[in-house]
Design a protein with these regions (language model features):
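Bacterial peptidoglycan biogenesis and beta-lactam-recognition machinery
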Residues: 2-3, 404
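His/Glu-based metal-binding/catalytic segments typifying zinc-dependent metallopeptidases
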Residues: 4-67, 152-171, 175, 237-334, ...
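Short alpha-helical segments and helix-capping/turn motifs at coil-helix boundaries
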Residues: 19-24, 180-181, 191-200, 293-296, ...
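M16 family metallopeptidases and their MPP-like homologs
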Residues: 34-44, 71-186, 206-216, 222, ...
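Short intrinsically disordered coil segments
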Residues: 52-57, 113, 226-232, 396-397, ...
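Long, compositionally biased intrinsically disordered regions
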Residues: 183, 196-284, 422, 435-539, ...
Length: 724
């Protein structure tokens, strides 16, 4: 059979299409400054390999880079508080979009006029070549490094190949053989390439649209009423026999969902044997050195002359009331002016000379004494060996010379954080629900919540709302927090490279340490004050995220590797069948940590009380767990698959440093792996009391639809809007 799989080209529009659509908000959410404006243009085809990369670099210059000209022009005119972009390059006719969030519908004309004014200026007067060069280096470094985290490189290369191969069977490699294209782009940077692209694809191109997405209260109820009316009309049009057939089909579907697949069919699927699996866990690379009296944890690995450097500063001197500022620092450092560079200049220098510098806050729990945890502020960079002096110089400038008193820039950053957090909470409510529930009993989760969770959102929302009255305090507290963190006493270094890289680190690290501040300050006293409240956060979402949490160690139970197997069993059997297949949720997850913290959570779930009941019955399922020997082996193999995800040198270094900070010994990892490989039905059933203990503690948090939560309000002690 010959199938015509060709995708037809869409005809271009004669003029820019303009449309207005609506999205639902609750009564608690504002209508003002809550519109999305999107400017969209079709740009060539996915088979143009030069355009494929050039548009990514152009996007970097226009919107993505800190201080990008087009983004800054929109923000300066008050058209949205968060400007972002997207390049959909995996379709035959790629689409480039510029989006203003938190705008007004009345700003549509100003939005388009500002975009086109900036584009005309760049097309006429030239692109910022240094920023374009930074963008090229940023993407080329990423391409050469090919760091895809836990995803196999082969898979990611294949997905890139599909961006062209889908549309021309003779062109599978044009986007994975990109080095020549990067070289060509560097050559044409001074020949007007990007100015021509702006003129051709963004200014003179009518194949585009302007979309306004406007908030509307009551829209969800309108749609629900329309759907109910449509279904009622359809039902009334059916005969008695047709109605009975639908009932019978539904019953048949439920029976099919409950019926296991025939064993003979399952056994046709090839499967590994346990004897095929390596019994030793992955090696830890921990070689403790000292440079200028600072501990340097060397992860001795071949990195192809790329050094992965992390400066980890213990936040032990930061008092509880300043911990939210530790989270804020990670969004401020590197994105504000310093005494030597404006923040766009700083970004250009970093991306031209390195693979980037990033900062973040992290929490490590001791693997032997679970009452101990460490809050660390991490400054990370990746560079070629010869650029180590440069990256340390930039790190010093960022942590010591940032101008926190720049009120305009600080306001922009806080508004952007708020916007991004609200977007993330909408699509990832399960993380909000899980962390909020666990923060009620787990110290490490409590402080994670302060640094990046809902408590941090509350801090950011207040800082955004009351910025004018708080701005001096915000700047002063950022300075104070930085001073308490960035000292020699607090520093431990993680360094992933070969011995030759370590040798090249000695001199610049010695010079860096010599310039570190020394501060005589007592360690802060942490005060964990948990408040147990069954909480629901309401939004206009049509789905729920239901989290049920607890801690099995509180009843004296110990961690075992069999819990890792149970996680897989839940993911592919109990929770999968009940929450996803029968319940209709998009996903379900669980976790059992070494410190006893336990969670079960649903993802994009149409249900609420029903899912909570499924979580409550989990211990009984474990108590009665019974599968064939073959299925037990499958669960073990699935567990090992999660433990043995591909790791590049950078990932191995991160894992090893985490083990060092948490005092995790190789023997612990080996014991855990043996417990996984030796897991049996009996060892799984023995976990029932652990699950029962955790669930019975009754820590519940739900993020979801306002009406659905109100229907089940008796389940909660506190109900609040998700967005403040």
């Amino acid at each position: 059979m010959q199938i015509d799989a060709d995708i037809a080209m869409q005809k271009p529009f004669n003029i820019l299409k303009k449309e207005t659509h609506y999205y639902a908000v609750t009564e608690d959410e504002p209508l003002e400054n809550n519109t999305y404006l999107s400017y969209n243009k079709v740009v060539g085809t996915a088979l143009d390999k030069k355009l494929y990369l050039a548009m990514q670099i152009l996007d970097y210059v226009l919107v993505m880079a800190p201080g990008a000209k087009l983004k800054q022009a929109l923000i300066d005119k008050g058209i949205g508080t968060d400007i972002y972009s997207s390049l959909e390059s995996s379709v035959l006719q790629p689409v480039y979009s510029i989006v203003a969030k938190n705008a007004e519908e009345s700003q549509k004309k100003a939005f388009v006029d500002t975009i086109e004014e900036v584009l005309r200026d760049i097309a006429k007067n030239g692109i910022d070549k240094r920023m374009a060069l930074a963008g090229m280096n940023y993407y080329e470094f990423k391409f050469r490094e090919a760091d895809y985290g836990a995803y196999p490189k082969g898979l990611m290369y294949y997905l890139t190949m599909m961006d062209s191969w889908l549309y021309d069977e003779n062109e599978p490699f044009i986007h994975v053989e990109a080095l020549d294209t990067f070289a060509q782009l560097r050559k044409e940077l001074d020949e007007g390439l990007f100015e021509e692209l702006i003129q051709k694809y963004l200014l003179d191109n009518s194949h585009g649209s302007l979309i306004a997405l406007v908030p509307k209260r009551g829209l969800e109820e309108e749609k629900a009423a329309e759907e109910a009316k449509r279904l009622e009309t359809y039902k009334n049009s059916l005969s008695k026999e047709e109605l009975e057939a639908i009932v019978a089909d539904t019953a048949a579907l439920k029976a099919y969902q409950d019926e296991p697949s025939p064993q003979e069919e399952l056994e046709r699927i090839p499967m590994l044997k346990l004897s095929d699996i390596e019994r030793e866990p992955a090696k830890l690379y921990i070689d403790k050195k000292s440079i200028a009296d600072v501990d340097v944890i060397h992860h001795n690995l071949f990195t192809n002359q790329i050094a992965y450097l992390m400066l980890a500063f213990d936040c032990k001197k930061v008092p509880d009331e300043l911990l939210p500022y530790v989270g804020l620092l990670s969004s401020v450092l590197g994105l504000m002016d310093t005494h030597k560079h404006t923040y766009p200049e700083l970004t250009n220098e970093i991306n031209i000379n390195s693979g980037g510098i990033a900062t973040d806050a992290a929490i490590y729990t001791d693997s032997k004494d679970f009452s101990k945890y460490t809050v660390m502020y991490e400054v990370k960079g990746k560079v070629l060996y010869e650029k180590l002096p440069f990256v340390l110089e930039m790190m010093h400038e960022i942590i010591y010379e940032t101008k926190f008193e720049d009120e305009k820039r600080l306001r922009e950053i806080i508004a952007r954080i708020k916007s991004r957090m609200e977007s993330n909470m909408t699509g990832s409510g399960h993380t909000v629900a899980m962390l909020s529930a666990m923060a009620q009993f787990s110290p490490s989760s409590y402080y994670s919540d302060i640094l990046r969770g809902y408590q941090y959102y509350e801090f950011i929302e207040k800082a955004d709302r009351d910025f004018d009255s708080m701005k001096e305090m915000l700047a002063e507290n950022l300075k104070r927090t930085a001073a308490l963190i960035f000292t020699k006493e607090n520093l431990t270094v993680s360094f992933t490279a070969g011995d030759d890289g370590l040798e090249l680190l000695q001199k610049p690290m010695t010079e860096f340490v010599a310039k570190l501040a020394q501060l005589q300050e007592k360690d802060a006293v942490r005060t964990f004050r948990p408040v147990k409240e069954k909480t629901a956060y309401t939004s206009s979402s049509q789905v729920q995220y239901v989290a049920r949490c607890g801690n099995y160690r509180k009843a004296g139970y110990e961690y075992t590797g069999a819990l890792k197997v149970l996680k897989i069993i839940f993911s592919y059997d109990y929770l999968w069948l009940n929450v996803r297949v029968k319940g209709g949720a998009y996903g379900c997850m669980s976790g059992f940590y070494r410190n006893g913290d336990t969670y079960m959570v649903s993802y994009r779930d149409p249900n609420l009380a029903e899912t909570n009941t499924i979580f409550e019955q989990a211990a009984e399922y474990v108590r009665r767990f019974d599968v064939s020997e073959r299925d037990m082996v499958k669960f073990i193999i699935g567990t090992i698959g999660g433990m043995d995800t591909p790791m590049n040198p950078a990932s191995k270094g991160v894992r090893s440093f985490g083990a060092y900070i948490c005092h995790t010994e190789y023997a612990q990892l080996k014991k855990e792996r043996e417990e996984v490989l030796n897991a049996t039905k009996e060892s799984i059933r023995a976990l029932a009391p652990l699950i029962e203990t955790a669930v019975s503690q009754d820590y519940l948090c739900v993020v979801g639809n306002n009406a659905k939560i109100r229907e089940n309000e008796q389940m909660f002690e506190k109900i609040e809007p998700l967005f403040l």
